[in-house]
């Protein structure tokens, strides 16, 4: 039998305004460079949803494995964070580097005009930091993965952004456990989660539902 669960709004967290047709989404890089990535499928997708797109200054920057210096990536993110006309920030890809710029960011204007931050993998740094501040964010597909994203991944992202009800079905597995639970969903990439322990961006998992994603992670790294 399939396990299923439904995502509902948590009243104790701050929800950024859901998107409406005509809103603008900023696409930028907080971590790895994306020199060879084709953003056309992502732009076409946003336009099909009735949304506009702004390309950040970090798209195309190349500094070793990173999309520019820590200061360049932080400045690009800060610009979109402070712009009230930007309703969502979509991180183009993961990799490594977001943790190097998180302490350079000022969320003062974000608190005045909250917006959605979207991504997975290395973007877990931002999700966790926002969670400590009491804000919701979206762990979802990124522009670099859109060409190979499943229909379910695309659909759930759209529903999350536009405030539509979400539900998931999980296939049978011997590790599944049946039951009921209600709580705030936290987590993200495992290697990022343990790297943030002891920092101001570390999440409190007590009485919450912990979600973990990763691959090729060794047990001794988290022992």
Report each predicted region and the residues it spans.
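Bacterial Sec-dependent signal peptides at the C-terminal "C-region" and cleavage site
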Residues: 1-11
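ATP/NTP phosphate-donor binding region
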Residues: 9-85
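Phosphate-coordination loops involved in phosphoryl transfer and adenosine-cofactor binding
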Residues: 21-22, 114, 207
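Short glycine-rich or small-residue beta-strand-to-loop segments that form or flank ligand, phosphate
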Residues: 26-29, 87-91, 210-213
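Short histidine/acidic/glycine/proline-rich micro-motifs that form metal-
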Residues: 31-34, 143-147, 215-217
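Short, well-ordered alpha-helical microsegments
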Residues: 36, 98-99, 126-127, 194, ...
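Active-site histidine-anchored catalytic micro-motif
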Residues: 66-176, 180-184
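ATP/pyrophosphate-binding catalytic subdomain of soluble kinases
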Residues: 154-223
